[in-house]
Amino acid sequence: RELDDLMREKMQTSAIPKLSNSTLSKLPSGVKIPNYNRSNLTAGIVHIGLGNFHRAHQSWYLHRLMQQGKGHDWAIIGAGVKEFDKAQRLKLLAQDFLTTLVELSPVGREVEVVGSMIDYAPIEANNGALIAQMAKPEIKIVTLTVTEGGYYVDPVSKSFDSSHPDIVYD
Protein backbone atom coordinates (compact mmCIF):
# COMPACT_ATOMS: atom_id res chain seq x y z
CA ARG A 1 0.00 0.00 0.00
CA GLU A 2 2.80 2.43 0.84
CA LEU A 3 4.45 1.87 -2.55
CA ASP A 4 1.19 2.59 -4.36
CA ASP A 5 0.87 5.84 -2.42
CA LEU A 6 4.44 6.85 -3.25
CA MET A 7 3.98 6.03 -6.92
CA ARG A 8 0.67 7.91 -7.13
CA GLU A 9 2.23 10.94 -5.48
CA LYS A 10 5.25 10.92 -7.79
CA MET A 11 3.44 10.08 -11.00
CA GLN A 12 0.15 11.91 -10.37
CA THR A 13 -1.94 8.94 -11.42
CA SER A 14 -4.77 7.02 -9.81
CA ALA A 15 -4.54 3.63 -11.51
CA ILE A 16 -1.39 1.70 -10.65
CA PRO A 17 -1.55 -1.90 -11.91
CA LYS A 18 -0.35 -4.81 -9.79
CA LEU A 19 3.32 -5.45 -10.47
CA SER A 20 4.06 -8.31 -12.89
CA ASN A 21 5.90 -8.97 -16.13
CA SER A 22 2.69 -8.31 -18.05
CA THR A 23 2.06 -4.92 -16.43
CA LEU A 24 5.52 -3.37 -16.74
CA SER A 25 4.51 -1.39 -19.82
CA LYS A 26 1.42 -0.11 -17.98
CA LEU A 27 3.33 1.48 -15.11
CA PRO A 28 3.50 5.28 -14.93
CA SER A 29 6.06 6.79 -17.29
CA GLY A 30 8.43 7.92 -14.54
CA VAL A 31 8.91 4.40 -13.17
CA LYS A 32 12.13 2.81 -14.43
CA ILE A 33 11.62 -0.76 -15.65
CA PRO A 34 13.99 -3.53 -16.75
CA ASN A 35 15.27 -2.98 -20.30
CA TYR A 36 16.31 -6.64 -20.61
CA ASN A 37 14.26 -9.70 -21.46
CA ARG A 38 13.78 -11.42 -18.11
CA SER A 39 12.87 -14.70 -19.81
CA ASN A 40 16.49 -14.90 -21.03
CA LEU A 41 17.93 -14.69 -17.50
CA THR A 42 19.45 -17.78 -15.91
CA ALA A 43 20.23 -18.31 -12.26
CA GLY A 44 23.74 -17.87 -10.94
CA ILE A 45 23.02 -17.03 -7.30
CA VAL A 46 20.90 -18.53 -4.56
CA HIS A 47 20.28 -15.91 -1.88
CA ILE A 48 18.92 -16.85 1.54
CA GLY A 49 17.13 -14.06 3.40
CA LEU A 50 15.35 -11.72 0.99
CA GLY A 51 14.88 -8.77 3.28
CA ASN A 52 14.84 -5.10 2.36
CA PHE A 53 18.63 -4.84 2.61
CA HIS A 54 19.18 -7.57 0.02
CA ARG A 55 16.52 -6.23 -2.33
CA ALA A 56 17.88 -2.67 -2.18
CA HIS A 57 21.52 -3.70 -2.58
CA GLN A 58 22.62 -7.04 -4.04
CA SER A 59 19.48 -7.51 -6.11
CA TRP A 60 19.61 -3.90 -7.35
CA TYR A 61 23.34 -4.07 -8.20
CA LEU A 62 22.74 -7.17 -10.30
CA HIS A 63 19.75 -5.49 -11.92
CA ARG A 64 21.91 -2.49 -12.86
CA LEU A 65 24.48 -4.85 -14.40
CA MET A 66 21.71 -6.55 -16.37
CA GLN A 67 20.48 -3.13 -17.52
CA GLN A 68 23.91 -2.78 -19.20
CA GLY A 69 23.42 -6.05 -21.09
CA LYS A 70 25.73 -8.00 -18.79
CA GLY A 71 25.39 -10.68 -16.14
CA HIS A 72 22.28 -12.34 -17.50
CA ASP A 73 23.57 -15.65 -16.11
CA TRP A 74 23.73 -14.21 -12.56
CA ALA A 75 20.01 -13.96 -11.81
CA ILE A 76 18.87 -14.67 -8.27
CA ILE A 77 16.89 -17.56 -6.89
CA GLY A 78 15.55 -16.43 -3.54
CA ALA A 79 15.28 -18.71 -0.55
CA GLY A 80 14.12 -18.72 3.02
CA VAL A 81 14.22 -21.22 5.84
CA LYS A 82 11.60 -19.89 8.24
CA GLU A 83 7.85 -20.42 8.27
CA PHE A 84 7.22 -16.70 7.66
CA ASP A 85 9.22 -16.93 4.41
CA LYS A 86 6.32 -18.85 2.85
CA ALA A 87 4.17 -15.70 2.75
CA GLN A 88 6.99 -13.68 1.20
CA ARG A 89 7.50 -16.33 -1.47
CA LEU A 90 3.80 -16.20 -2.39
CA LYS A 91 3.82 -12.40 -2.59
CA LEU A 92 6.89 -12.39 -4.83
CA LEU A 93 5.53 -15.21 -6.98
CA ALA A 94 2.35 -13.18 -7.58
CA GLN A 95 4.47 -10.36 -9.00
CA ASP A 96 6.81 -12.57 -11.04
CA PHE A 97 9.59 -12.00 -8.48
CA LEU A 98 9.81 -8.33 -9.45
CA THR A 99 10.48 -5.86 -6.67
CA THR A 100 10.38 -2.08 -6.50
CA LEU A 101 13.09 0.16 -5.14
CA VAL A 102 12.06 3.63 -4.03
CA GLU A 103 15.07 5.89 -3.59
CA LEU A 104 14.43 8.98 -1.50
CA SER A 105 16.55 12.11 -1.68
CA PRO A 106 16.20 15.75 -0.66
CA VAL A 107 15.04 16.56 -4.20
CA GLY A 108 12.46 13.81 -4.60
CA ARG A 109 11.94 10.13 -5.22
CA GLU A 110 13.07 7.69 -7.90
CA VAL A 111 11.04 4.52 -8.43
CA GLU A 112 12.64 1.54 -10.17
CA VAL A 113 11.37 -1.98 -10.79
CA VAL A 114 14.14 -4.52 -10.14
CA GLY A 115 14.07 -7.69 -12.23
CA SER A 116 17.15 -9.66 -11.19
CA MET A 117 15.25 -12.32 -9.21
CA ILE A 118 13.69 -15.11 -11.25
CA ASP A 119 12.53 -17.66 -8.69
CA TYR A 120 12.12 -18.38 -4.98
CA ALA A 121 12.70 -21.91 -3.70
CA PRO A 122 9.71 -23.42 -1.88
CA ILE A 123 10.11 -23.51 1.91
CA GLU A 124 10.14 -27.09 3.16
CA ALA A 125 10.79 -28.59 6.59
CA ASN A 126 13.85 -30.48 5.35
CA ASN A 127 15.03 -27.64 3.05
CA GLY A 128 15.08 -30.09 0.14
CA ALA A 129 14.12 -27.50 -2.51
CA LEU A 130 16.77 -25.09 -1.24
CA ILE A 131 19.45 -27.78 -1.23
CA ALA A 132 18.45 -28.83 -4.76
CA GLN A 133 18.76 -25.24 -5.99
CA MET A 134 22.17 -24.81 -4.36
CA ALA A 135 23.42 -28.05 -5.95
CA LYS A 136 22.60 -27.01 -9.52
CA PRO A 137 25.76 -26.70 -11.63
CA GLU A 138 24.84 -23.23 -12.91
CA ILE A 139 24.77 -21.80 -9.37
CA LYS A 140 28.04 -19.95 -8.91
CA ILE A 141 27.58 -18.68 -5.36
CA VAL A 142 25.22 -18.89 -2.42
CA THR A 143 24.79 -15.68 -0.47
CA LEU A 144 22.85 -14.79 2.64
CA THR A 145 21.86 -11.81 4.67
CA VAL A 146 22.05 -11.87 8.44
CA THR A 147 20.48 -8.96 10.27
CA GLU A 148 20.47 -7.90 13.88
CA GLY A 149 17.22 -9.83 14.29
CA GLY A 150 19.12 -13.00 13.48
CA TYR A 151 21.42 -12.77 16.47
CA TYR A 152 18.92 -13.67 19.20
CA VAL A 153 19.78 -10.93 21.65
CA ASP A 154 17.87 -10.83 24.92
CA PRO A 155 16.13 -7.43 25.02
CA VAL A 156 16.66 -7.00 28.77
CA SER A 157 20.27 -8.10 29.22
CA LYS A 158 21.38 -7.14 25.68
CA SER A 159 23.30 -10.41 25.67
CA PHE A 160 23.12 -13.41 23.37
CA ASP A 161 20.04 -15.49 24.28
CA SER A 162 21.37 -19.04 24.32
CA SER A 163 18.05 -20.28 25.74
CA HIS A 164 15.99 -19.20 22.71
CA PRO A 165 14.22 -22.30 21.25
CA ASP A 166 15.87 -21.82 17.83
CA ILE A 167 19.33 -21.76 19.41
CA VAL A 168 18.59 -24.73 21.67
CA TYR A 169 17.34 -26.66 18.64
CA ASP A 170 20.53 -25.90 16.69
Give, region by region, the residue ranges found by the protein language model.
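Non-transmembrane, aqueous-exposed alpha-helical and coiled segments at domain scale
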Residues: 1-170
